Structure formats: C-alpha cells, structure tokens
Design a protein with these regions (language model features):
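Bacterial N-terminal signal peptides that target proteins for export
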Residues: 1-13
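Bacterial N-terminal signal peptides
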Residues: 12-21
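Boundary at the C-terminal end of the N-terminal hydrophobic targeting segment
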Residues: 26-28
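Low-complexity, Ser/Thr/Pro/Gly-enriched N-terminal "stalk/linker" regions
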Residues: 30-98, 123-131
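Hydrophobic alpha-helical scaffolding
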Residues: 89, 93, 248, 268, ...
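Aromatic-lined, polymer-binding surfaces characteristic
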Residues: 96-99, 104-114, 121-317
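Extended polysaccharide-engagement surfaces of secreted carbohydrate-active enzymes
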Residues: 320-572
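Conserved small/polar residues in nucleotide/adenosyl-binding loops
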Residues: 573-579
Length: 582
C-alpha cells in the first residue's frame, strides 16, 4: 500500500518516496466491445479504423436503444448512485432531455453515414426527429416549456441538440415542417437568448443562436458575439482554457471541442476572425495535451465529470479543421482509439447497457451531484470524429506512438511545464506513464457541490497507471498528505499555492484548511522511476501526519510493513507492495 506516519513538534523534512509503476490486464468478457477484423496494417497498435469507430458507436448506442420500444419512449435510464439526480419528480424532465441530447452526440455522426440506421426495431432518424418535434409540443410527455427563470441544465442540453442538428441537418432538421421548425426554434431561443453562466456554459447559448441564425431566424447578434468573446477571454495559453476556476478536461471536451466545431459549422461564415482565434488556440494544444496520455494511449483519471471518460479525445480529430501546422495524426488517432478501448473493452464499463457512473466502474467519489445516468453520454462527443470524411488524414495515417518512439528515451524523465496555467505534465519512458500536477485551492466549507475540494482535484499528482483512491476516515489516503486536525479527523491538503518550476523541481506551498498554522512547503522532483519528494512541514504543536503513495493494486503479493525510528520524536511506518516489472 502507501503510508508513512510522522509526529513532529515544530518542523520536519519529509524526503522521498520513489514509486515503481505496475501493470495489469483485464480479460475480455461478453459485455465488452470487440474489434472485429482488426486492421493492423493501418493501425498496428489498436487495429481500429474509421469503420471500427462506427461499430463502436453502434455498440454504445444499442445499449441506449434497448430502452426504446416506440417513438414516444424517452431516453431515461436506471438511476445509479444516490448522490446523482433526479431526486424528485421535478428533475425528471431534464434528466430525460439529457439522455436525448447526449445520445444524439453518438447518433448524429452515425446517421450522417447511414440515415437508415435501425436500433431495437426503431429507425433511429425517425426516433430523434419525433423527439425533437415533441420538445415544443405541449401535449407530449417530452415537452419543454419556454424559459421562465435563470440559467439551467435545459440550456446545456438544447445547445447540445443544436450541434447535432447541424451535424446531421439533412436527416434531423431539414425534413421538419416550417411550423415544426418555428415552434422548436422558439423554444430553443427562449433559452439561448436567456442568461448563462460565465464558464463553458456560454457555448450552449452560442450554438443555439448560431444554428438558428444559420437557418434564417432573427437572433440577438450582440449577445452571440459577446458570449464568443467572453469564451475566448478564458484562454490562458498552451492550449488551455480556464473553466472558472479550474483546469481540467473541460478545457478539452468543452472549449477545445466546441470552439473548433463552432468555427467549422458556423464561425467561418458568421464571425471569421473569432473562428480563426478558436482554431489558433486549438492548435496550441498539440504541443502539450497529447502528452497527458500514456505511451499506450490511456487517459488519466483527473478532474470532475470523469464519467465522461473518452470525451477527453474529442478535440484530437478536430485538429483537421486547422491546417496551420503539422500534426502527427497517426499518434493522435492511436491515442483516441486506445482511450476508447480503455473503457469499451472492460466488462465493468456498462451496466444495464448504459455506461456506469464512475471511471472503470461505479464509483461515487468521482461523480458529482449535477449528473444523472444519461449524463455519461457526454462521452459520445468522441464520435464527432466521424464527421470527418474517410480520406481525412486522421483516418488514413498509420498509427504510431509519436515521441514515445524515439524522443522520449528510457532512463530519462521529461517534464512539460506550461507557465500560463502552472500545469506540469511528466512523461516516464521507463514505464510509459504520464502524470499531471494541476490547480487546487478550494475549501470544503465553500465547496457547496463538493467536487473542487475533493480527490478529483486535491491529489499531489495524477498518474495514468494509478487511478486515484478515495480517502478514508482512518487515514487511508492516496497521493496526498493527511493531518490529524484539532477535531481528531484526518484532513488532506487542498489549499495549494504554486511557487515555481525550475531545474526539474515543482514547488508549491499548502496550508491546512482548518488550521493555517499547519504549513507545507512541497517540492516534487520527478525521476526516471518515480518521484523524489523533499517537503517541509511546520506545525505549532505535536501533530500526526501521514503521506500517501499512489493507490496500488494488490496483485499476487502481500503487503509488507516495516517501521523505522529515524530520530526522536520522528517515526515512520511504511507499507509497501513488492514491485514487479511491467
């Protein structure tokens, strides 16, 4: 396992834990996606081609359509985890709308390729058209009334529908009558022209307004342009947007996906200068973002909404929209396909035919209260890659491992520091792992949604090979310090302040939320086979603290415990697992 305990009266220097990286595998079962007739000529690592992506999309969508038996049935799935919504009847309509809008992220690209697609005996195009019409039909159980208050989840889902309606316009929008279009437009514009939140939410106003403007409807152009400029103002450089206030996958699966999609669908015609800026910002991510993934192409468990999983690769294919610089599409597609299979090939990914609320399986600490079961289909944005034609370089390039082939040499460690955000990405060629150090400065007391102060953000680092473990009440803490506070409770660090990155050393200070006299000066030094920590802890009275390692799997070896007394009053207890090579 992972812990050291320390008692100290004034100050202590904690130096060192070096971790060896372990690997494991999961046997395939019936409940998993299988790559049929893999093409190892074009894709020597995953076997995945564009046709396999289509099959993967159909596999994912089939589970949702198992709940659909008539055109009037709604995309409403069994609730999983008590903390998720709906918690009352009033929240059910928007949960159903989420299921509709987010499964359409998968369905729209499939329909563009195959308008006659049938699932569970239902013509998929007929189903979604029927549901779109019903949104503005007061007699339908799918009816969404016009906006009456402030920003709500309904805005997000209607904005998502606008993306899919444009992506497959000939199938989803054009066949509607003028009366049906006008009625749906009025419903959507009541939200799109309404208030929003100054984060990625502004994109949903943008897509509603841009789509309706594209279709000839009169919209609030000033509000549209204002939201676009505010979104661009959230850019911090090196491919990263700040999502008020965090850095996480929302930079990728929201800003760096929606920005280029908007530019391609609407922006080049409506606001060409703003469109070009979104594309330029997107291109900046090439030098950093792909390095977050492991050598094997796996994504990291990092940040909120991690149940969206492979939505993390959504922006990669969209680099095709910007031709200003060179992109290694063989590496980019290898990452995208590997991350997709990272989940689709695991039997725990689906339950009742629907993706689970978690990372690999149901896991409440990684799920937020704003999510419902249908929320998970945000992952479907990965299939926006299918909007690219078959001859796009993203699909035709031969898979490769990019810089992992020659540039990232074994025996070394490689850090990519991004000064605009203070993010640090570290690559370990010896193990193939990638690691992230990022922002966290949120108190539990002010974190009313209980996610920015939690394990989703507060770890010392996040590693592709070690999905994080939830902290326990008895000091079971992974990749963080725990301090026994004045209430006798174990309290982890979450109030970090970045100091510097120089000479391979990433420095942060931290204080305990409930006792600012407990101070940490942290120094992370990535090494080829792990991390050297040189940390100073200052306390005003005798205090018990512990340092947690990455959470490790217990494979075929037992935990070993050793105790060492270094110098009074300092003592250590170290729990380890014998390491094995990958």
């Amino acid at each position: 396992m992972r812990r050291r305990a320390l008692k100290n009266s004034v100050a202590g220097i904690l130096a060192l834990f070096v971790l060896s990286l372990l690997g494991g595998s999961v046997a395939a079962q019936e409940n998993v996606f299988t790559v049929q007739q893999p093409d190892y000529q074009r894709s020597p690592y995953t076997g995945m081609t564009r046709q396999h992506w289509i099959q993967a999309g159909e596999y994912l969508l089939q589970g949702a359509f198992n709940y659909i038996h008539t055109l009037d049935d709604q995309m409403y799935f069994p609730k999983q985890l008590d903390k998720t919504y709906p918690n009352n009847d009033g929240q059910v309509p928007v949960a159903k709308l989420e299921g509709l809008a987010r499964t359409l992220f998968v369905a729209a690209p499939l329909l563009k390729d195959n308008p006659d697609l049938v699932m569970n005996g239902i013509k998929v195009a007929d189903y979604y058209r029927h549901q779109l019409v019903n949104l503005s039909n007061p007699k339908s159980k799918s009816y969404i009334p016009h906006r009456k208050g402030g920003p709500s989840q309904t805005l997000l889902e209607l904005g998502s529908l606008a993306i899919s309606m444009k992506a497959a316009q000939a199938i989803l929008w054009d066949p509607l009558t003028k009366s049906q279009k006008d009625s749906l437009a009025a419903t959507m514009l009541s939200y799109g022209e309404g208030p929003t939140i100054g984060s990625n939410w502004m994109f949903f106003n943008v897509f509603i307004l841009s789509f309706m403007k594209d279709q000839g409807y009169v919209v609030n152009d000033d509000y549209l342009e204002s939201n676009l400029k505010k979104l661009l103002a959230r850019y911090r450089g090196e491919g990263w947007y700040n999502d008020a206030p965090a850095y996480d996958y929302y930079s990728a699966w929201a800003y760096q996906t929606y920005g280029p999609i908007w530019a391609e669908m609407f922006g080049k015609k409506q606001y060409p200068q703003l469109a070009q800026q979104f594309l330029a910002n997107q291109h900046d991510m090439v030098a950093n973002y792909p390095y977050m993934f492991s050598r094997d192409g796996k994504m990291n468990m990092w940040g909120r909404s991690i149940c969206y999983r492979f939505a993390s690769v959504a922006p990669l294919a969209l680099l095709e929209y910007d031709q200003s610089g060179e992109v290694n599409y063989g590496w980019i597609r290898r990452i995208a396909s590997s991350t997709l299979l990272q989940f689709l090939e695991r039997p725990e990914f689906l339950e009742d035919g629907v993706p689970t609320m978690g990372f690999y399986e149901p896991f409440a600490p990684a799920v937020q209260i704003y999510s419902c079961r249908g929320s998970v289909y945000w992952c479907g944005k990965a299939f926006l890659s299918l909007l690219l034609p078959e001859d796009a370089e993203f699909w035709t390039a031969k898979e490769n491992t990019g810089p992992w082939e020659k540039e990232l040499k074994k025996g070394n460690v490689y850090n990519q520091f991004q000064p605009g955000t203070n993010l640090l990405i570290t690559n370990y060629p010896n193990s193939g792992a990638s690691e992230m150090r990022s922002w966290c400065h949120e108190t539990v007391a002010k974190d009313w949604q209980k996610f920015r102060s939690t394990e989703n953000y507060n770890k010392l680092a996040y590693n592709t090979e070690f999905p994080w473990m939830a902290d326990g009440n008895n000091g079971e803490i992974s990749m963080n310090y725990g301090t026994k506070n004045k209430k006798g409770e174990w309290e982890v660090l979450r109030l970090y302040t970045f100091q510097s990155f120089k000479d391979g050393i990433y420095r942060r200070d931290a204080v305990l939320e409930t006792d600012s006299t407990v101070k940490y000066q942290l120094a992370d030094i990535p090494l080829p086979n792990g991390i050297l920590r040189v940390d100073k802890v200052s306390v005003s009275e005798p205090t018990e603290i512990c340092l947690g390692h990455y959470s490790l799997p217990r494979l075929n070896t037992n935990i070993q415990e050793t105790s060492r007394k270094v110098d009074r009053p300092v003592s250590y207890t170290h729990l380890t697992l014998p390491t094995t090579s990958r």
